Amino acid sequence: MRLLENLWGKKPSRKSDKKKKGSSNYAYAVTRVRAMKSKLLPKESYPRLLNMGIDEITRFIQESEYKNDVDELAMKYSGGDLAEHALNRNLALTYDKLVRITSGELNYLIVAYLKRYDIWNIKTLLRGKIYNASVEDILESLIAAGEFTYTSMSELAAKATYQEIVEALKHTEYYPLLQKFDGTNLAYIENELDKIYYADLFEAIGKPRSKDRKLFAQVVRLEVDVKNLINLFRLKKAGVMQPDEIMPLMIEGGLELKIEKLAALPYDEFVNELQRTQYWEAISGVVGPDMISLTTLESRLTRYYLESSTILSHVSPITVVPILDYIIHKNNEATNLRIIFRGKETGLSDELIKDQLVII
C-alpha cells in the first residue's frame, strides 16, 4: 500500500475558481488534449488483443501509454491484478494532468465533472466492506481521479467496517446520505449518490448561456438519458412497472426522454415510445420481447453516447467539450482493457468478451 502511495505521489490541488472566467486557457488545453486523444488505442487493436493471452496483452499495453504504470507496478502485481492497478493509476494521473493544464472556468468545469470518481470510490469502499473483500481487492478498484487522494482512500479501505468508513467521511457533503446506510440498502445509497453527483454538476454548469456551457450541458444531459434508459430497461425486464417504484431510481436533468411517461408504460408500449427518440436507431436491432441480456443494449447506448460527444466536440472546437470528449473516451479505453483482462482471466469466450466492449 505504501509503495503505491509513493508511486502515485501528491494530487494537484483541486481548488478552482469559477469566477476566473477571463483566465481560462481553452486554446492551449484543447491543443494538448487533442494530442493526448491521438494516442488512444485505435479500434484495430481490439481484435488483436482478443487473440492474445494475458501476458501478451500486458506486454502490448506496456508498449503504449501505459508503459510507466505497468513498469512501476510490476514489482508488486502480476496478471489481471497488475492490469487493473495500472489502468486505474493511468486514469488518475491522466485526469490529474488535465486539472494541471487547465485554468479558470475551464478548470472549474473539469474538476466538477471528475468528482464522479469520488462517487465511484465511495460505492467501491462500501461494497467491498459489506461483501468482506480484502483491502487489496478494494484498492484494485479505486480510481484516484476525483478529489479524494489515493492515500486517503487507502486509509478508508483499511477500515474494519463500513460504519468506520461512513464516520471518516463525516466532513463531506455525502455524510447525511451515508448515515442512512445500514448494510442492506446499498442500491438505494448508490442511486442517491449518483443523484447528488449530477445535481452538483448541473449546479456547477449553472444556467448555460454561453455556447461552451450549453454544449457541456448537452453532453451531460445525454449521459443522464442513457443512464436512465438502461435503468428503465432493467426495471421493465425485471417486472417493475409501478411509476412510484421506478421514479425514485431516475436521475433528473436528462436531454430528451420523458421519464414519467415512460415509467408508466407497459414494456411493449415503452418500446414503441422509444421509436420516437434519437436513441432508437442505436438500439432497434437488439430490442425485442425475447431480449434476455442487456449487455448489448448497454454497449449500443454507450457507443451512441461516445459518438455523440465526439460530434459535439467538433461543433465548437475551442471549448470544454473536446476535453470532456477525451475524458469519456479515455475512460472507455480503460474499461475495454479491463473487460478483456478480466474476461481472459475468468475463461470467457472471445465472443462474450467482444459483446461487452464498446469500440469506436
Curated annotation (Swiss-Prot):
It is found in: Cell membrane. It is a peripheral membrane protein. InterPro entries: ATPase_csu/dsu_sf (IPR036079), ATPase_V0-cplx_csu (IPR014272), ATPase_V0-cplx_csu/dsu (IPR002843), V-ATPase_V0D/AC39_subunit (IPR050873), V-type_ATPase_csu/dsu (IPR035067), V-type_ATPase_csu/dsu_dom_3 (IPR044911). One of its GO terms (cellular component) is plasma membrane. PANTHER family: V-TYPE ATP SYNTHASE SUBUNIT C (PTHR38682:SF1). Belongs to the V-ATPase V0D/AC39 subunit family. This is A-type ATP synthase subunit C.
